[in-house]
């Protein structure tokens, strides 16, 4: 195996582990608000502005079908609602409701405490550098997936 392959494998395995750790932590944070981490992810995606299901899926890097399933459950529980999309008649917008905002607000104190704990372990500068590195890694993978790295 080449050094580059070893790095790719190491990065992938580390990110898979991180994903599992974040899901475990997220479920623990979300449960007292009566939601799952999957629900919280979709709610967070539309917290600032309504988005179509496809837009949420693109932003999260997951399938449209999985977002659609969660969005339907959120709408059924009145945590989100569908709104008309002026840009596309068939692709409704997912918007968070007051009940959804209240659920996210209930998560806030525990979320803040977890962020403080992680910052205390890593240190603020290393925490920020880690986020920047993960963001660059994601952008590099987007470039490869899009094929724009081939010139």
Which residues make up each language-model segment?
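C-terminal regulatory/oligomerization modules of transcriptional regulators
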Residues: 1-3, 125-151
């Amino acid at each position: 195996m080449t050094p580059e392959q070893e790095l790719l494998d190491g990065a992938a395995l580390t990110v898979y582990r991180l994903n599992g750790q974040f899901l475990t932590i997220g479920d623990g944070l979300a449960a007292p608000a009566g939601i799952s981490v999957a629900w919280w992810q979709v709610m967070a995606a539309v917290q600032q502005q309504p988005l179509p299901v496809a837009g949420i899926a693109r932003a999260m890097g997951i399938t449209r079908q999985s977002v659609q399933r969660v969005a339907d459950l959120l709408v059924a529980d009145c945590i989100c609602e569908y709104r008309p999309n002026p840009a596309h008649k068939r692709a409704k917008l997912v918007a968070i409701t007051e009940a959804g905002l209240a659920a996210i607000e209930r998560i806030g104190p525990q979320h803040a405490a977890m962020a403080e704990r992680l910052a205390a372990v890593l240190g603020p500068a290393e925490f920020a550098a880690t986020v920047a590195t993960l963001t660059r890694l994601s952008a590099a993978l987007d470039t490869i997936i899009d094929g724009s790295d081939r010139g």
